Each structure stands twice: as C-alpha cells, then as structure tokens.
Amino acid sequence: MSYDDHAVLEAILRCAGGDERFLLNTVEEWGAAEITAALVDELLFRCEIPQVGGEAFIGLDVLHGADRISHVLQVTDGKPVTSAEPAGQELGGRTWSSRSATLLRELFGPPSGRTAGGFGVSFLPDLRGPRTMEGAALAARATNVVLHATTNETPPLDRLALRYESDKWGGVHWFTGHYDRHLRAVRDQAVRILEIGIGGYDDLLPSGASLKMWKRYFPRGLVFGVDIFDSRRATSRVSRRSAARQDDPEFMRRVAEEHGPFDVIIDDGSHINAHMRTSFSVMFPHLRNGGFYVIEDTFTSYWPGYGGPSGARCPSGTTALEMVKGLIDSVHYEERPDGAATADYIARNLVGLHAYQTTSSSSRRAINKEGGIPHTVPREPFWNDN
C-alpha cells in the first residue's frame, strides 16, 4: 500500500477522535484489511528496539465484525520489530487480538489510559508443560514490546533524535529542548508538520532522520519533507518530495496548497540566507493560526559562504538574522506612527518570536491586532527631570 498521498492516514486521524459509529463507518469505507495494514505499519514503527534475550513470533489478530485479519510480528533481540510470514513460524507462545476500532483509537486517538478488556491474549497448548517456561517468559517479554507501542507514552525528544540519528541533539546541535518547550502543548494533536531539508544528500538510505523523529514525537501527526536532493520514498505518515530548491516560490506554494496549512514549518534546508528569507516570506502565510515557523542554523548569517557579511562583525541587511530582528518591529507595528499603513501580512499575523544562541529562531502566527496602547497613555514621561 502506498502512503504517498496520506489518504488512508488522514481518514484514520479524522475518525480516531470521533464517535464509534463514525470510526466504524470509516473502517468499512476503506476496508478492514487496508486500515489494518496501516495500523500494523504504525505499530511496527513505534516498537522500541527489543531487549528480550532471544527471538519470538507474536501473532496479531485484528477483529472487525466477523472478519479476522491475522499478522505475525517477529521480535528479535536488538533488531527492529518486523512483519513475518505466518507459514512455518512457531508463534512465541501467544496470540494477541484486538478490535480494529480499539487498536485504531489506541494508536491515533486522543491520549487516554488503557482500559481493561482492550485486548485479548491466547496461549498455545504447548505452553502447558514445564519444559516451556523459558519460552513463556520470552513470549511475555516480546508481547510487552508490541503492547507498549500502543500506549500514549512517547519517549523524550532528545532520545528520539538519538534513536533516529537526527543531528538535532547530541552532536553539533542541541535543539530538542527548545523544540519541546514550544511544541509539547500540541504533541497529542492531529498536526501537520513540514520540514524543509531531509538530509542524506546523494546517499538516500539514511535520509529523513528528523522526519522519523517528528513522526514518533507527534503520534497523531502527518509529516512532510522537501529537499533539493531526490528523496521520494515515503513511509506511513511521512511524505517526501523530490529535488526542488527552497528558494523556488512557485514550488513551495504548490507544496503548501497540496499539504497545508501546517501547524509547524521547520527550515533546516540549505541555510543560505537568501533561501531562508524567501522560504519564510512564502510559507509563513501557510501556517495555521497558532502555528510555529522555525528557522534553524541562523548562525550562517555570520558566514560569507552562506550570504553573510565579509569582514564585518554584524550580519548585513540581507541575512536571516537581520530579517528576524526586523520581525520584532513587525510584532509592534501598532505602536509605530506609520504602522497601520505599512503593516504587511506578516506584521498583522505575527504575535511573538524566540531566538536561541547559534541554534534556531521560532515565530508564532496568530492575529496581531490588539489595538495598540490607548492614546490616553502619554507618549512622553509624565514626570519632570529638570
């Protein structure tokens, strides 16, 4: 099944927080097998690397009405959990069963504690003898790896960065604390994330590390990525667009029209100052109200090779940091004498920004029209210093 257009996942996310009838109708519309394939794909992605001391094959039965859709999951110590062919496999002592609606809600619904009776476990007959106790313990550990992946517990962002080998933490950059501070409030919402810059360059296999990180951090999110290098491969809830420059306004507008509006836009692209400025001016209007626009690596404003000044101490007027400085004036446009006449879209829709040392700056979109400070407040000091 292809997830390039996110149609199945978008349908799942729409119904996961709805009533039971809407959810079941969605499963019927798409087909239980199609929905189950997407759920199993997500389940495998969320499984932690097992530390189980061996290998076990766990059966998974997803029930929908009279239908029973069976999968086998291979849980091997130190390796990612994968799907396995049922034929010829000895299940590791148990089969786990869940209703399609229950599994869908646990993976993609709003946060909630697991209730009793959410799943069933059946033991195989060959576990009744004393010789199989070690196998039973292995099966229990393997089953726990899979069951834990359905909970609402998400690892901290720094751990996710290390797991998926993103450079946002632990090496050159230390961004995850800043991201978590601003984004944790929407972590469990059905958000849409766009990241400019996928990574991997001409070696496509390791690309998309931060996209996977965001996919795991936002369990109900859809993640999109664009890059100048061809990275078209997609996985569930992650879509990648192929070679295009971020300073191509028409291309970026097409991305926004096709996949937006976005809750978060992250510019981790070329880091060339002109590109960052172009992307911001084009893409900021495609943030939803309350969304965040993040520009990483603004320290290139000091590097001539990226469009920074040559031989000067401060960034020139054409750098990303100078643009950020100008945004402070934009936030306060209502206090300027010419504010109402000169305010552009960004000024009228930017309510705040944060800047961090050599790392990133984030801007929040919302309606910026509080009326300004009343004219009854004097514009000169009311005390006399003379």
Curated annotation (Swiss-Prot):
Pfam families: MycE_N. Residues 364-386 are annotated as: Disordered. Belongs to the methyltransferase OleY/MycE family. 3-O-methyltransferase involved in the synthesis of L-oleandrose, a sugar attached to oleandomycin, a macrolide antibiotic. Acts on monoglycosylated macrolactones and mediates the conversion of L-olivosyl-erythronolide B into its 3-O-methylated derivative, L-oleandrosyl-erythronolide B. Also able to methylate other monoglycosylated derivatives, such as L-rhamnosyl- and L-mycarosyl-erythronolide B. S-adenosyl-L-methionine binds at residues 166, 195-201, 210, 227, 245-246, 268. It comes from Streptomyces antibioticus. GO terms for molecular function: metal ion binding; protein homodimerization activity; S-adenosylmethionine-dependent methyltransferase activity. Optimum pH is 7.2-7.6. Gene3D superfamilies: 3.30.1050.30, Vaccinia Virus protein VP39. Mg(2+) binds at residues 268, 296-297. The gene is oleY. This is L-olivosyl-oleandolide 3-O-methyltransferase. It comes from the Bacteria. Homodimer. One of its GO terms (biological process) is antibiotic biosynthetic process. The keyword tRNA-binding does not apply. Keywords: Antibiotic biosynthesis, Magnesium, Metal-binding, Methyltransferase, S-adenosyl-L-methionine, Transferase. The active site is at residue 271. It is an enzyme of class 2 (transferase). Its EC number is 2.1.1.239. Its cofactor is Mg(2+). InterPro entries: MycE_N (IPR040800), SAM-dependent_MTases_sf (IPR029063). Pathway: Antibiotic biosynthesis.
